[in-house]
């Protein structure tokens, strides 16, 4: 959805920081959009990337960090969010394995501009397939409504996106 914003913050060739341990569905959509993945090693005790290692891995081409909290063990999201704000890098959460987990009294899956949850049969909440996306960005919200409905805009309030682009 970040690609479809009016002022797209991502371009083909931009760099995304990702953990070396995740699921293929975390990586493939990023590759399909032409983004370059920069893998960061995880700590063997937490199975997560440390915020410091992620910080060191960032370059001038880094535009997005995909934080993945593994097995209910949150990444250092508070540090990452602060770092991202300072460096003007987008933070996105893959929270498919940590529904209900908290980091400093805040639920995981609420720190990023886009936050994903899976309802695949092996996850915390199962609908056999599917998922949930959370965002507090109004434009992304409306884009998601459109994507969910194969491009139909009838659910968008006042045809939000059409009016903005005319």
Region spans (language model):
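Phosphate-binding glycine-rich loop
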Residues: 1-15, 29-33, 39-41
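Proline-centered loop/turn at the N-terminus of a beta-strand
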Residues: 15, 36, 63, 88-90, ...
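Hydrophobic residues in well-ordered beta-strands that form the structural core
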Residues: 18, 39, 91-93, 117
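Conserved coil-to-alpha-helix start sites within the AMP-binding
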Residues: 21-27
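Aromatic/hydrophobic pocket-lining residues that form π-stacking "cages" and hydrophobic walls in ligand
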Residues: 26, 80, 144
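Catalytic PLP-binding core of fold-type I/II PLP enzymes
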Residues: 51-66, 72-105, 137
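Active-site region of PLP-dependent enzymes
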Residues: 98-104, 111-166
């Amino acid at each position: 959805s970040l690609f479809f914003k009016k002022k797209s913050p991502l371009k083909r060739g931009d760099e995304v920081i990702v953990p070396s341990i995740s699921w293929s569905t975390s990586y493939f959509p990023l590759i399909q959009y032409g983004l370059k993945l920069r893998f960061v090693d995880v700590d063997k005790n937490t199975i997560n990337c440390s915020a410091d290692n992620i910080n060191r891995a960032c370059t001038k081409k880094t535009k997005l960090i995909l934080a993945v909290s593994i097995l209910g063990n949150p990444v250092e999201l508070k540090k990452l969010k602060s770092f991202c704000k300072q460096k003007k890098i987008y933070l996105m959460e893959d929270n498919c394995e940590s529904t209900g987990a908290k980091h400093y009294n805040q639920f995981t899956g609420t720190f990023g501009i886009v936050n994903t949850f899976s309802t695949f049969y092996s996850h915390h909440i199962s609908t056999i397939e599917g998922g949930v996306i959370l965002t507090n960005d109004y434009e992304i919200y409306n884009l998601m409504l459109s994507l969910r409905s194969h491009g139909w805009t009838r659910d968008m309030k006042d045809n939000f996106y059409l009016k903005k682009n005319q």
